[in-house]
Amino acid sequence: IGSAGCGPTAMAIEISTLTGETVTPKMTADYSIEHGEYVSGQGTSHSFPANAARHWGLSVKRVGKNRMSEVVQSLKQGKLVVVICAPNTISGSSGHYIVLTGVDAQGYITIADPGSRSRTGKVYSVDTIQSYGRNLEDGAFWIIGK
């Protein structure tokens, strides 16, 4: 989990928060391996967030970078959002999953970063978060709710 566990950790954060159940990164990592969602040397696949959310009984909607108003509105409604960040944005030279946890009174987005306690709880502008998202045809943002 240490070297390629941001996806399972991000999903454990979301699932535990939204369901009230204790779901650990090991549990979500095991799920990813058992269901072919782990890609050796790369981490978890881009289908993993949606499949894991559904497995634990949550709703999920995948959207692109052009739908940030929907992302912000979903956060205001109490949903959480997983983002697959592009390389060389929020961390290192590879992609990285983070969790968007809310929006403050000034419209900044709060994050939980599975790879950085120092970034967890910090706020970022909508434009910055949008720029971090990967340019994927199916979208880099998974809106997850109950």
Predicted segments — roles?
Residues I1-R62:
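Cysteine-nucleophile protease catalytic domains, especially the papain-like/related folds used
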Residues V63-K65, P114:
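Conserved beta-strand termini and adjacent loop/short-helix elements that scaffold enzyme active sites
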Residues V103-K146:
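Noncatalytic regulatory segments and standalone regulatory/sensor domains
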Residues V72-K76:
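Short amphipathic alpha-helix with an adjacent loop that forms part of the alpha/beta core around
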Residues R67-V71:
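Short acidic active-site motifs
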Residues C6, L80-S118:
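Catalytic nucleophile-His microenvironment captured as a short glycine-rich beta-strand/loop
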Residues H55-K61, Q77-V81, A105-Y108, E137-D138:
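Loop/turn elements at helix/coil->beta-strand transitions in domains of secreted/extracellular proteins
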